[in-house]
Amino acid sequence: MRGVPTDIGVIHFVGIGGIGMSGIAEVMHNLGYQVQGSDLAEGPSVERLRGRGIQVMIGHAPENIENAAVVVTSTAVKRTNPEVASALENRIPVVRRAEMLAELMRLKSTVAVAGTHGKTTTTSMIAALLDCGDIDPTVINGGIIEQYGSNARLGDSEWMVVEADESDGSFLRLDGTIAVVTNIDPEHLDHYGDFDGVKRAFLDFIHNVPFYGAAILCIDHPEVQAVIGQVRDRRVMTYGFSLQADICGVNIRPEGGGNVFDVIVRQRGEEDRRIADVHLPMPGRHNVQNALAAIAVSIEMGCSDEVIQRGFESFGGVRRRFTKVGEVGGATIIDDYGHHPVEIAAVLGAAQEAVSSSDKGGRVIAVAQPHRYTRLRDLMDDFQSCFNDADAVYVTPVYEAGEDPIDGIDAEALVAGLKSRGHRHAATIADPQALARTLAGEIEEGDVVVCLGAGDITKWAAGLADAIAQERGA
């Protein structure tokens, strides 16, 4: 028997509306499993799952799992959750999300995409190229792929592309045939203890690749480059802007709000070749780097140079990754998930690139919502220096994500640090209404307002253009 039998009975997902859980639930439903779930509140994911024919109950209660054969949870769900507690009491198997994803992966050959940043976009780009190459993969992603209107879909081929979440170490359960590592930065230190623990986990992830697979690694990132020499018994393909890369991006030029670039391909036993004029409809060098990872995977899987040239042309991106959500008075409102200093710096760099290439000119205005007190504490120095490409910075209150406040770690401390490091325009902002009032008197045609964070800042961004217009009309 290979994988979970489809006649196992009802599989119940606790927190089914979460971005990680919903994708697995949707794919399992499409494979013929009996799937249901519960969540604390209504939302777009819940609505989408119901539209697919999946029963979703609002609220967590023991009676929700009376007919369940298996209960699936994420590490964020505590054992005291009433559904989990009832399952344990009644000896119903309780499995972690990553364990269920690993079972799904046993059904397919898999591309597993890991990294501190960029994995959601990279996963989506890989899916786009494989689609273009008629490989038709199953996809489970950590963000909504605009082309699908979902973060998951069931394909017809033997291949699956998954985002491997390193936040709690559970990605070590995911043994990819092809493993991609985009970068390794200090993150999730509450789980790993220190940065050395993070690095060890990524090395273990790479070593999980089977002997017939490959590790695809970003040579531009110093910590990833340092890992290459430690991988002695698995095949490695590197990508990046470094001239030492096997898949090397060169001749990069911003064009039409995106990028055009060439790719030099170096494969053992073959002459170097150049794939010219790859069009990527996304700004920022970091997105070109993500695209190079996708190109490396597609080359490893035998896609043609023509597929690589045209595969990104219809790529619609990923929701909350530099997503335009509004326009007011000629200024653009962008919503982005970036919440780590490296991500923030990359997104603001892309925004400056877009402004600089525009005929209108303009400024970049960052609205940042710190996510978790522990992250802000652990990376405060980095946060204080990642906003250099923003002409103005407004910092909202910290999004707690279930954490208790930490004395001296808040929006005021971040703003004070920005000012002490020479930032000319940094201030706190209390709420969406205050933000709209402030920006109504400040933004001009050509400006780009970038709302950044993994919390509810996305709601601020969604209503910001209308709120500014109302303030100006008042």
UniProtKB/Swiss-Prot annotation:
It is found in: Cytoplasm. Its main location: cytoplasm. NCBIfam families: murC (TIGR01082). This is UDP-N-acetylmuramate--L-alanine ligase. HAMAP family: MurC. It catalyses: UDP-N-acetyl-alpha-D-muramate + L-alanine + ATP = UDP-N-acetyl-alpha-D-muramoyl-L-alanine + ADP + phosphate + H(+). Pathway: Cell wall biogenesis; peptidoglycan biosynthesis. It comes from Erythrobacter litoralis (strain HTCC2594). Keywords: ATP-binding, Cell cycle, Cell division, Cell shape, Cell wall biogenesis/degradation, Cytoplasm, Ligase, Nucleotide-binding, Peptidoglycan synthesis. Coiled coil: none annotated. Its EC number is 6.3.2.8. GO terms for molecular function: ATP binding; UDP-N-acetylmuramate-L-alanine ligase activity. GO terms for cellular component: cytoplasm.
